Amino acid sequence: MMQGLFFEGKHEQQCVFDRYYRTNPFQGGYTVVAGLEHLIDYVHNIHFSEDDLAYLKSTGFFQDEFLEYLKDLRFTGDIYAMPEGTVAFPQEVLLRVQTKKDEALLLETCMSMIMNHESLIATKARRVRTVAGKDNLMEFGLRRAQGKSAGVYGARSAMIGGFNGTSNVLAGAKFGMPVLGTMAHSWIMSFSSELEAFRAYARQYPNNLILLADTYNTLKQGVPDAITIFKEMKAAGTLPKAYGIRLDSGDLAYLSKEAHKMFVEAGFPDAIIAASNDLDENLISELKAQGCVINSWGVGTNLITAKDSPSLGGVFKLVGQYDDGKFVPKIKMSDNVEKISNPGLKNVLRIYDKETGKMKADIIILEGESIDESKDLLLQSDKAPWRSRTIPGGTYRVQKMLIPIFQKGELVYQKPDLKEIMAYADQQIQTLWPEYLRLVNPEEMWVQRSTKLSALRDKVLKEESAHFF
């Protein structure tokens, strides 16, 4: 497409593309935006190397004149986006690109891959955090991840979603994340007995004393052997503040309760009981409902692969272009009504209740529109007009959600560190009422188009429809 536009003389036409999605993953009530830092690095460094150009030439698809043009191609436009950790909803503009058309097309695939994947994992992680409460959450997914990049960036996304650390050492090094983990069954099987394996581990890692208790028999051997080690270390004055076991199989609710009883009777009521074994938010919720005594969770496969919703349907659509210096809104029509796009240069205004700090609604606007917080605000529903309601002036505040990231090809955004992103993500979740956080049948956030945007959409739809009727 880029080459075709080049020879048609349209490659440098200024245009606007929006990135958004249509449906929340996991049948949930929200999506956590992630991947912006990864995207920034990609955009900032995008270029064609000599090897890239040589390969493109070898395919036989590309002409020399176009390949010569690609040598100096860099991103020269503007990007606006919601910051990482932002809670978002269907149809909202998550990211807006204003640039030459060939540059936008060059960004589309990688941009979609990065933000679809990382937002998906961050959202899954946040659902796990919601049910885990204040428990420790460890990301254990690398061995089941669909590739190195998915494992590394998935681990970072899990942190944005609320996890405490990862077993992925590369991710820890790359992003400054806490590296957490325990032993494997192979460690225990490498020694003459489980007790000797535990003793050896305690010698080597006295401050990381989480012993894997289910290699042979959890309650008859694993837990008693762990208690023996704890007693030996206590007598020697070397028992760390944090110590305990991990369960990786069996009835986790029953085993954790029985193990806890044994620890209490032995004088170790504070022993940590960690659990793993194909966990996700649904299973953790069930285990807690059954009274499990688990306060640390290793979540791997179902998180890193987003098993029950393995893709986020984010799209990147042309919403306007400049023809002879005049901005012309564009719309994608479809036989599926939900796939009809919103034309024009847009932003999102978020409405918060001043008293509670909770989110009340999002309004998709045309860029330049504003809301007077002192005046009553009418929320109108296209689907259910009888649900329309008014928010009294003075009781709400408004926040514009898209902020500048690149301007004229230059990075103008000060990238926050991961801890800052995590704190912001936590704050965002706190603005949602619990009804929006439910795992099953969550409340749907109120999202509407502004009156001006609705009018523009209707106008462009009518103009485009005239070609067919």
Tell where the protein language model's regions lie, with residue ranges.
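Glycine-rich phosphate/ribose-binding loops and adjacent secondary-structure elements
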Residues: 186-364
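Ordered alpha/beta subdomains of enzyme catalytic regions
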Residues: 1-207, 234-235, 317-469
